[in-house]
């Protein structure tokens, strides 16, 4: 299977030209190319997410961390009387360069798509706040993976005839989810639940081209179209350790350490497939006639096993700095598609990142860039797609969080829009592997925090 993957990637040739949609031969295996399971805010810090949440005593980031639902409890926790709603949307532009050392070739692809849409509602009451409790909920939609490839390969058979092979695939996996997070004193717990759904369509078209008979094309088509879906659930926990308090106001935390964990058990998705194996013939006008249906089976029921995953991390925060580190693990060896294993393997990733916020309590609001948050990070791990050799996956990231508001409102972070950006430069493979993929991903996120659904007290 791994050798087949290598051949397919090398065979891409000029098919992988820059376009509006990604053309990745890696997406032929497993559930496709996995999309980042992080919002733009955390992507700028290498993707650390397990222990990130807004703290009531620090300047908020106003972004919804869907990776660990326990973090929802931090939304607007500092101002329980204000029921501001956060709308969070992320988009990204990917540019990929795939390199093969033997033979020496280079292919490129580009794509733009929406990373996530989500909205969060704080539910904390004043009575809950008095008991050091906070609560919030969210709803959202995000992609889990993408499948999109078109690979062509031609070869001579007997010196006078040719065989043309076309591999095509499309689809992907998405999640529509509802989340809630509750914090009691220093402990937070949360849960995401919803529906995971998608499609996985594959076809292999073999065309025998006769050089001795004019305009004769003899083609076989093998195609499978699968739709699937099912309920999913994941959860998370966080705990805060106050390392220091304000000398004048002992109830205010000035240094905090948070630990977090999140994950999901193995999920079973119900699937339905339509399979066809047919022989067709192309005429000189480009049309075709079905000569024979070798095999056809409709509405074949089965299951897809989505593997268990877990992540844990810790994060330090004070008025100006935030540091964090995460460890992630995916049990992809248990992935099954209609009972069949695939070219996938267990994978792990380590992430680390930091954020710097220059503004202090006495910073003049005229100094706009002191109110911008600056981020950087990196990640290193193994790819879940299995090839002939272990391929590391690593990258470096930088990002910003820029308030979009007038200068006079910079001191009121709960009442403005934040533009988050993240630039990722990543790699799949190294000098020891025949195939390397370079990635440049630019992400933009908009977090809008406003009292959208509140009735005015006065007309």
Specify the residue positions occupied by each region the protein language model found:
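Bacterial Sec-dependent N-terminal signal peptides
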Residues: 1-25, 139, 459
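Subset of outer-membrane beta-barrel
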Residues: 21-459
